[in-house]
C-alpha cells in the first residue's frame, strides 16, 4: 500500500481567535484523495464535539423581548452576543459563568467568571454596553455537545421563567475546503494525487487536533469491518400450505385405504406429500387400487405426488 504523509503548510490565528490550517496529504493513488477529502470533511463538519452557550439568565429579565434600563443593547442582542462567545469546556457537566459589571463599561466575554474547567477563547467579544449609574448582572450556561441543538421549551429542566434558552451550535469547525492536485507520474505510468485541505475552527480547537480527532473517529468506524465474521443464514422452514394441513379424514377415502394409512402413521395431507406412488404400494395391505384412490383425492385439492422416488 502506498505510504503518504501529511504536512501543515499554513497556520493563522485571526483577531476573533478563529484558526485556519492548510494541510497537504500525499502522494495518494488515483481516487484516494476524493475518498479522504469527503470522509474527513463530513466528520469535521458534523461529528466533532464542541462547547456552546445554551442559556442565559439576566437579573430582572424574564423574556427575550425585554429591555434593560441603562443598557444600550436589548435582550435579544445580548443573547445573540452570548451565543457567539467561543468557549472550551473540559468537562461533560453543565458549567455556569457569572458577571456583575457597573457602568459606564463595555461588558466583554472575559468578564465572565467560570470554574477552571472552562476557557473563554475570544475574551474581547462584546456582550453589552452599560451606562453610568447602572449595572448588569448575568450568568451564562455552557455545555458540551455535537452538532446543533434547538431550544426545547418543553424541557422541565430548562423551563425556568428567567432562564433564556439559546439554540446551541456545538460545531467547533466552521469551514472545510479541499482540492485535489495531480503530482508527478510514478514508475509504470500510474499518476499520483495530492489532497490540499483547508480547515477553519472557532479557536476552541486547533486545525491539527480537529484533523486528528476526525481521523480517529473514522478509524473507530471502520475497525469492526476488519474483523467481519461470516454467519451462515439459517433458512427458515417453509410455512405449510392450507391444503397440506388438511387431516386425512377429510379426503373421504375408503375404509380400507384410510385404515392402512393410519397404521402407517399418515395423519394429514402433509404426511402424504412425503410419499411417492411407489412408496404407497409398499404400505402393508395397500394395493394399486388404494394408491390410485389416494392420487385422485390429492389431485382434487391440487396436489400431485411423484410416481417414483427418483422423480421426487
From Swiss-Prot:
Top-level EC class: transferase
Keyword Transferase tagged: yes
Superkingdom assignment: Bacteria
Region described as Alpha C-terminal domain (alpha-CTD): 239-312
Catalytic activity as recorded in UniProt: RNA(n) + a ribonucleoside 5'-triphosphate = RNA(n+1) + diphosphate
Gene3D superfamilies: 5' to 3' exonuclease, C-terminal subdomain, DNA-directed RNA polymerase, insert domain, RNA polymerase, RBP11-like subunit
EC number(s) given by UniProt: 2.7.7.6
Keyword Transmembrane attributed: no
Keywords for this protein: DNA-directed RNA polymerase, Nucleotidyltransferase, Transcription, Transferase
Protein function: DNA-dependent RNA polymerase catalyzes the transcription of DNA into RNA using the four ribonucleoside triphosphates as substrates.
UniProt family annotation: Belongs to the RNA polymerase alpha chain family.
Protein name per Swiss-Prot or TrEMBL: DNA-directed RNA polymerase subunit alpha
Organism the protein comes from: Synechococcus sp. (strain WH7803)
Name of the encoding gene: rpoA
Amino acid at each position: 500500500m502506498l505510504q503518504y504523509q501529511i504536512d501543515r503548510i499554513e497556520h493563522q490565528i485571526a483577531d476573533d481567535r478563529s484558526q485556519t490550517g492548510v494541510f497537504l496529504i500525499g502522494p495518494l493513488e488515483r481516487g484516494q484523495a476524493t475518498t479522504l477529502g469527503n470522509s474527513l470533511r463530513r466528520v469535521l463538519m458534523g461529528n466533532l464535539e464542541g462547547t456552546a452557550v445554551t442559556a442565559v439568565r439576566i437579573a430582572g429579565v424574564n423574556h427575550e423581548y425585554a429591555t434593560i434600563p441603562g443598557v444600550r443593547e436589548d435582550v435579544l442582542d445580548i443573547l445573540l452576543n452570548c451565543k457567539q462567545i467561543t468557549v472550551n469546556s473540559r468537562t461533560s457537566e453543565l458549567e455556569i459563568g457569572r458577571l456583575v459589571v457597573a457602568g459606564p463599561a463595555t461588558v466583554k466575554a472575559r468578564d465572565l467568571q467560570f470554574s477552571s474547567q472552562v476557557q473563554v477563547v475570544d475574551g474581547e467579544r462584546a456582550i453589552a454596553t452599560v451606562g453610568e449609574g447602572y449595572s448588569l448582572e448575568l450568568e451564562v450556561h455552557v455545555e458540551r455537545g455535537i452538532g446543533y441543538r434547538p431550544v426545547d421549551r418543553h424541557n422541565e429542566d430548562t423551563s425556568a421563567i428567567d432562564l433564556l434558552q439559546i439554540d446551541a451550535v456545538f460545531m467547533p469547525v466552521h469551514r472545510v475546503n479541499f482540492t485535489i492536485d495531480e503530482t508527478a507520474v510514478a514508475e509504470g505510468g500510474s499518476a499520483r494525487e495530492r489532497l490540499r485541505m483547508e480547515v477553519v475552527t472557532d479557536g476552541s480547537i486547533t486545525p491539527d487536533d480537529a484533523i486528528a480527532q476526525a481521523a480517529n473517529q473514522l478509524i473507530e468506524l471502520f475497525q469492526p469491518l476488519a474483523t467481519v465474521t461470516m454467519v451462515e443464514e439459517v433458512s427458515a422452514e417453509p410455512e405449510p400450505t392450507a391444503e397440506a394441513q388438511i387431516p386425512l379424514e377429510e379426503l373421504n377415502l375408503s375404509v380400507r385405504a384410510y385404515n392402512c394409512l393410519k397404521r402407517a402413521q399418515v395423519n394429514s395431507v402433509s404426511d402424504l406429500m412425503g410419499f411417492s406412488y411407489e412408496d404407497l404400494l409398499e404400505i402393508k395391505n395397500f394395493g394399486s387400487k388404494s394408491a390410485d384412490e389416494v392420487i385422485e383425492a390429492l389431485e382434487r385439492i391440487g396436489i400431485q405426488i411423484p410416481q417414483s422416488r427418483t422423480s421426487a
